[in-house]
Swiss-Prot record:
Organism domain of life: Viruses
Protein name: Truncated non-structural protein of 4.9 kDa
Family that this chain belongs to: Belongs to the coronaviruses ns4.9 protein family.
Organism: Bovine coronavirus (strain 98TXSF-110-ENT)
One Pfam family per UniProt: Corona_NS1
């Protein structure tokens, strides 16, 4: 379920800036 939640957060900006996406993953968990 967590993996699906992470994919839902994916956006073009996240793909260009993986570091920002990582921060978003750490907070919800």
């Amino acid at each position: 379920m967590k993996t699906k939640f992470v994919f839902d957060l994916l956006t073009p900006d996240d793909i260009l800036h993986p570091s920002n996406h990582v921060n978003l993953i750490i907070r919800p968990i």
